[in-house]
Amino acid sequence: MPFVQRYSDVKKGAIIFAGNTLGLSKAANSNSPGTEGSIGAFTSLNTSLQVGNFPAGTTLDYTLNGSRAQLSLPAGSSVLYAELVWGGLYRSTVNNISNLINNPVVFSTPLSANVQIAPDAATSQDFVITVDNVTVGFYVRSANVTALVAAALSGAYSVQRVPALIEAIDSRTSQTNHAGWTLAVVYENQTLDLRNLTLWSGGNVVSPSTGSTTVTVTNFLTPVSYTHLRAH
């Protein structure tokens, strides 16, 4: 079940996304800054923490990780649905934290601080793949956070305590250390066009070893004639 439909309606409105990484790129075989495309340290909202030569606000402890993003809704908007999605690397050749990936994460809105958000089993997905003869595991979790976002609307949002592994030795993960989050918000605004607003949640793996991937969605309808037909 790569993707699960979470919301669908026809309204004057749109879908907007906010989110952030939870780590900074590493150097080869080291927890130091570099350009390997694999994270070497988590970001943290605590700027008194620092990992080596990484900037302040970094940690190797997932329970201290965190990042912020700005949600900007047009004036006069109301939130119809909001989904928080997060994930990361949970398995390397030497470590496996599958016992932690269903733990709640900490979500803060402009109005509510440090709310524990438990993942919804309906959208929980784990992926085990082999990259360059290295077997690794990724996961995706999500939850409905509509009430929190509808109350807070625009402003700074943050997510903390997302379980994930960081391995310094690249051969343990084939350079796939990662962690991050996305907030998907479906909103209504009477100044916008009438649209079919449908949101799916889930994940799929795309890598050099797996090649391209095809995602099938159902019940997707379009007008017979429309000059501005778009999808995201």
Locate each region found by the language model.
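Extracellular structured ligand-interaction cores
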Residues: 66-68, 79-81, 100-104, 154-156, ...
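Extracellular and analogous surface-interaction loops
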Residues: 68-78, 147-149, 187, 215-226
